[in-house]
Amino acid sequence: MTSLSPFPAATHPVFPVPAHPVLRVPPAPPAEAAAHFRAMLAFHADVSDVAAALAADGDPGFVLLDSRSTEAWEQGHVPGAVHLPTALVAEQAEQLLDRSVPVVTYCWGPGCNGATRAALALAELGFQVKEMLGGFEYWVREGFAYDTWQGPEQRPADPLTAPVGADDCGC
């Protein structure tokens, strides 16, 4: 009988096939899981972590890049972010960014892949890059201040995305 597991039989313990889908494919062996999750953290940054780094005294060690259109930027953006629309990365990144400083990209939110496309373009140009999970949507929903063409704004934290009255989720 052929196994449907993505792992060779010798790398995971005997695991009965459950009736529900959660464990129908067994969890990865710990070393493989650690490598996978470490790699995920090499590609992504959390909104709360970015906010904490930007709020701390001194240089956060990265540049935050808003990859949306000018209209979107004016509607609202993270304070201190650099504006470089995805379509202009190849043409303007060299003039706006320092290759020795990591870049964290963001776009509208989880339903938009503009930050992913900008991150790809930057990586292809030789920049170290991560993507901010949740984008501008989650920045606003977590209650962080943002700038608009009319000035600064801030909304209360959405209790479905961030603890109300706390600086971070404690993750």
Identify the role of each PLM range:
Residues A93-V140:
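Catalytic cysteine-centered active loop of the rhodanese-like fold, especially the PTP/DSP P-loop
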Residues G58-L64, P79-G80, P102, Q128:
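Short active-site oxyanion
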Residues V82, S100, Y146-Q150:
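Short, hinge-like loop/turn segments at secondary-structure boundaries
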